[in-house]
Amino acid sequence: MGTPETSREPCPDRILDDIGGAFGMGAVGGSAFHFIKGTYNSPKGSRFVGGTQSVSMNAPRTGGSFAVWGGLFSTFDCTMVYLRQKEDPWNSIIAGAATGGFLSMRQGAGAASRSAIFGGVLLALIEGAGIMLNKVLAQPQNMMMEDPGMQGMPGMQGMQGMPGMPGMQGMPGMQGMQMGQMQSQAQIRSESQNQNTASSSSSSSWFGGLFDKKKEEVQPGSESKTEVLESFDAPPVPSFEFK
């Protein structure tokens, strides 16, 4: 059984991609957090130096922790995709719970179970927010696609997104403009077809005229030859009888 096709990267590449992305997020976010913390905790006159030292000491560790979490999450996610043979939010929720529980196993069963519940709830909230955001973004597109009167006219699709333009469909002149444009397009197409047929007929008539002339020139000659042969009388057969 193979991994089903999804919009994300395949599982080996997905794991590496998530590890790199999580490390980048942890490094950038950790740098900002530890710089502010080091600046606040440093004495006056050396706050900037204290902030940079705090970043250099703690930001790589934070990025590594994020990378470990992202790698384990992607591994569990790919495992669920392989076992269930489908891609849905439940894979991410189960992977988040498994990751939280796995990272807290050294602290005991109670801490591992609490971390698993926290990871599952966190991933459920993230997946729910993503689904709601996709629905909200998909509604305007569906409304534009379901509008049958404005799709046929060129440039109306861009005008639908402008404020104050939803009432353009009900105007009495819009249908007449659309019919006029359709008729003009049909006339242009018919004229182009007529020009093509006229050019092809003229070329064929030109070649046909040449061949017809040759035929006409050949046919009178052949008729004259036959007429001359028919009018010519054969000579009498000589006889050798003595008279």
From Swiss-Prot:
Asked if Transmembrane is a keyword of the record, the answer is yes
- One GO term describing the cellular component: mitochondrion
Q: Where is this region: Disordered?
A: 166-243
- Which body tissues produce this protein? Expressed in roots, flowers, leaves and young cotyledons.
Consequences of knocking out this gene: Lethal when homozygous.
The sequence repeats are found at: 149-151, 152-154, 155-157, 158-160, 161-163, 164-166, 167-169, 170-172, 173-175, 176-178
Bias (Basic and acidic residues) occurs at 211-228
Keywords from UniProt, A to Z, are: Membrane, Mitochondrion, Mitochondrion inner membrane, Mitochondrion outer membrane, Protein transport, Repeat, Translocation, Transmembrane, Transmembrane helix, Transport
Q: Where in the cell is it found?
A: Mitochondrion inner membrane; Mitochondrion outer membrane
| Name used for this protein in its record | Mitochondrial import inner membrane translocase subunit TIM17-2
Question: What organism is listed for this UniProt entry?
Answer: Arabidopsis thaliana
In the UniProt record, what gene is named as encoding this protein? TIM17-2
